[in-house]
């Protein structure tokens, strides 16, 4: 799937610990919920064609080489976790991400044709892209926590799941020759690390960084989608 279509998205979070030997929160309360928001920073997506082909209903010429760049966007997340022990939890995180395309940078130029209109990009050229990607994601996996003191914990986790995204390009360089609107669902994975700060025995704030992957590549066209996320969440135990 057009890597750049990855709405990824992706992105999605899923970590949270529990009381180790400190009173960060009560280990008797095994179930916890969280909600948060943050920033998603997508990496560039490579576009490369060795032969002429059609992808996303757009006909591309052979030997195109370049990359799509994206603006930073926002992410809203929800978290449900269950403590298996004092230092191990299993979590499910859902997320909604939204970000815009920035530009298409071409090292080797070529053409793209859609709806009877042809976009032509020269070698070593850059073109403004009017488009966006939005994604819903869900990831499941373990989370480990390590106490620093009675208030602060280090959290490490990861998981696998899916990203369902909508990828739309309206125009490139004021031409609709490379325009499309596609919906895809792909495998997604995430690695995360962060800190928990206890507010009381029932709640805490979590700040974390995540590296997100979406298996969205298209053979002879685009690479997979990856992105960095930075989030803050409020979590409460039940």
What are these regions (language model features)?
Residues 42-72, 97-137, 163-186, 214-227:
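Extracellular/periplasm-exposed beta-strand and loop segments of Gram-negative cell-envelope proteins
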Residues 22-24, 84-86, 142-148, 197-201, ...:
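Outer-membrane beta-barrel proteins
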Residues 31, 87-90, 151-152, 197-205:
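Repeated loop/turn-to-beta-strand initiation elements of outer-membrane beta-barrel proteins
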Residues 35-39, 78-82, 138-144, 158-162, ...:
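Residues on the lipid-exposed face of transmembrane beta-strands in outer-membrane beta-barrel proteins
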Residues 22-81, 235-237:
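Short glycine/proline- and aromatic-enriched beta-strand/turn motifs that initiate or cap beta-hairpins
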Residues 1-29:
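Cleavable N-terminal export/targeting peptides
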Residues 21-34, 133-159, 209-213:
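Short, contiguous, well-ordered secondary-structure segments
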Residues 68-83, 87-93, 131-143:
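Outer-membrane beta-barrel transmembrane strands
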């Amino acid at each position: 799937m057009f890597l750049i279509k990855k709405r990824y998205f992706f992105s999605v979070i899923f970590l949270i610990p529990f009381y180790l030997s400190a009173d960060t929160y009560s280990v008797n309360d095994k179930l916890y919920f969280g909600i948060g928001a943050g920033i998603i920073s997508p990496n560039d997506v490579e576009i490369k064609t060795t032969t002429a082909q059609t992808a996303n209903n757009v006909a591309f010429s052979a030997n195109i080489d370049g990359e799509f760049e994206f603006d930073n966007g926002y992410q809203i997340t929800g978290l449900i976790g269950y403590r298996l022990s004092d230092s191990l939890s299993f979590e499910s995180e859902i997320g909604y991400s939204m970000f815009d395309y920035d530009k298409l940078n071409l090292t080797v130029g070529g053409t793209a044709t859609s709806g009877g209109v042809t976009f032509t990009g020269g070698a070593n050229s850059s073109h403004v892209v009017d488009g966006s990607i939005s994604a819903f994601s869900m990831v499941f996996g373990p989370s480990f926590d390590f106490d620093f003191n009675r208030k602060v914990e280090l959290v490490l986790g990861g998981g696998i799941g899916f990203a369902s995204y909508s990828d739309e390009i309206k125009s490139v360089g004021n031409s609709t020759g490379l325009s499309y609107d596609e919906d895809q669902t792909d495998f997604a994975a995430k690695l995360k690390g962060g800190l928990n700060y206890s507010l009381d025995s029932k709640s805490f704030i979590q700040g974390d960084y995540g590296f997100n992957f979406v298996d969205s590549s298209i053979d002879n066209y685009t690479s997979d989608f990856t992105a960095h996320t930075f989030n803050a969440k409020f979590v409460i135990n039940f």
